[in-house]
Amino acid sequence: MDKQNIYITTTLPYVNAEPHIGHALEFVQADAISRYFRTKLGDENVFFNVGTDEHGQKIFNKAKEEGLSLNDFVDKYAQRFKDFCKLFSVEYDNFYRTSTPAHHDAAKIFWKKCEEKGDIYKKQYSGRYCIGCERYLTEKELVDGKCPDHKTVPEIKEEENYFFRLSNYRGPLLKWLDENKDFLKPESKIPELRKIIAEIEDISISRLKENLPWGIEVPNDPEQVFYVWFDALTNYVNAVGFGTDEKRLSEWWPVYSYVVQTI
């Protein structure tokens, strides 16, 4: 195998509850891949990232329920996940936390880059909001009027939020999929994925700060905070230098990479 950088990352678990066996499976799988490539390429060519997702409505509610400040609450559960990794002898290179100032700064840089490309706009929106999912659900996603995952009736909310023009990427994503048919196994699932991509809609990426004070403030708009998924997903590039160390970023991204995700 030729020498190359291998970047391995798990998803970032939410810190609204204790670690569980599903997290262990993901951490251990990623650790096994990391160890394998270290034997082939050496430690210097492998970077293994784990961490915790620490913003959003569920965390805000849970901290209030436990009578803790938000910072104390996320510190407590981030440490639980660190201890959990230690329990399973998971040897990561970086434990990434989305509540840190460094993450906030990098996420804001990412927002501004999206804005400069014309991918962000603001509009009034009304929809069915599931607190458990922390997102708006469409009519066709509901089962008997309820969220299929949380079995609750979504709240009807009306807000002015920022949206990401995800619909602009239907064409490029379909083209990429056509050119990389070995991306998905089994190939019989490609038509299903094509259908999902063809139906992509723009997504809400902010929330009113008066309703959710625990989040990253949107650049140049103190009344809005990042929607938790939009800020958390930037961790994968932030962890290897986006917004802070462009030289390091160029060494690890884009590279031959593994994203290990078990849900």
Region roles according to the model:
Residues 52-58:
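Short, charge-patterned binding micro-sites
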Residues 59-66:
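Glycine-rich loop at the start of a catalytic domain that most often binds anionic cofactors/ligands
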Residues 66-216:
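Residue patterns forming the tRNA-binding/recognition surfaces of aminoacyl-tRNA synthetases
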